[in-house]
């Protein structure tokens, strides 16, 4: 695990302890049960069936490596722009300390559109999964580099019991082998090297032959141009999670359409 990931995980554990005091788990479960669900995996498959790229478009204000990506940051506006220009789903950062995200951003983005929404955060505890459902998320992220295989399996089982889709994210072959023990069809390959923070779509391409056909490969990070998209689609990768390229554009949805459609 990288130093930054170690730091983030430590902060997450503290956040969970504090959150459990202010909003007990049973209270959250009650709130979660009243939320509607949107079909995250179904939305991706619908794009594939139409012969289109399935884009999980990210609502992200900042990152630890790049700082603030977008000064004019209005999640509802961004979500509507993404939906209008063909996104399949949204990904919304809820991590406050490292990515300047917020639960409120997820709630605002989801309320502004009809797209399913992934809670993008560092999940280390079952509490965060119930919390995700309570805030209106339709899917959660599990990061293989941050979790033991048995932890991932337990967290996935809880997520699925609540109706949430699970995107499991890997950075290398060892993590991929762990991820493939899960039931989720969604295998995210993060093209960012956790030690150097450099990105290369070769990371995704190099792992494709090890992934069964019944899984949906989601390529993440470092997709910055139409050339990247065309290269990956030629390799039969049709699902993309993109944030930075859209966030730096004047009109995020227009940039999405320019890159993908």
UniProtKB/Swiss-Prot annotation:
The EC code for this enzyme is: 4.1.1.48
CDD domains in the record: IGPS
Segment forming the signal sequence: none
Q: Does the UniProt entry include the keyword Oxidoreductase?
A: no
SUPFAM superfamilies on file: Ribulose-phoshate binding barrel
Q: Which Pfam families match?
A: IGPS (PF00218)
Catalyzed reactions: 1-(2-carboxyphenylamino)-1-deoxy-D-ribulose 5-phosphate + H(+) = (1S,2R)-1-C-(indol-3-yl)glycerol 3-phosphate + CO2 + H2O
Q: In which pathway does it act?
A: Amino-acid biosynthesis; L-tryptophan biosynthesis; L-tryptophan from chorismate: step 4/5
Q: Per the UniProt entry, what are the Gene Ontology biological process annotations, in alphabetical order? A: L-tryptophan biosynthetic process
Similarity remark: Belongs to the TrpC family.
> In its UniProt entry, what is this protein called?
Indole-3-glycerol phosphate synthase
Which organism encodes this protein? Paraburkholderia xenovorans (strain LB400)
């Amino acid at each position: 695990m990288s130093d930054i990931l170690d730091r983030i995980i430590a902060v997450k554990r503290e956040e969970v302890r504090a959150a459990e005091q202010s909003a007990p788990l049973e209270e959250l479960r009650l709130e979660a049960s009243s939320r509607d669900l949107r079909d995250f995996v179904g939305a991706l498959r619908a794009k594939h069936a139409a012969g289109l790229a399935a884009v999980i478009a990210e609502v992200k204000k900042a990152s630890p490596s790049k700082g603030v990506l977008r000064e004019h940051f209005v999640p509802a506006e961004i979500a509507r722009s993404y939906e209008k220009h063909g996104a399949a789903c949204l990904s919304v950062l809820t991590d406050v300390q490292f990515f300047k995200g917020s639960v409120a951003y997820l709630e605002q983005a989801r309320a502004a559109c009809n797209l399913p929404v992934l809670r993008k955060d560092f999940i280390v505890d079952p509490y965060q999964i119930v919390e995700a459902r309570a805030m209106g998320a339709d899917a959660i992220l599990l990061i293989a580099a941050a979790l033991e295989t048995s932890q991932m399996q337990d967290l996935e089982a809880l997520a699925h019991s609540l109706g949430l889709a699970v995107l499991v994210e890997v950075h290398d072959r060892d993590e991929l082998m762990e991820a493939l023990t899960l039931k989720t069809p969604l295998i995210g390959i993060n093209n960012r090297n956790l030690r150097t923070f450099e990105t290369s779509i070769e990371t995704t391409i190099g792992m494709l032959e090890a992934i069964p056909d019944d899984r949906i490969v989601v390529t993440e990070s470092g997709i910055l141009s139409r050339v990247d998209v065309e290269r990956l689609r030629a390799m039969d990768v049709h699902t993309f999670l993109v944030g930075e390229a859209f966030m730096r554009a004047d009109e995020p949805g227009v940039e999405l359409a320019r890159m993908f459609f």
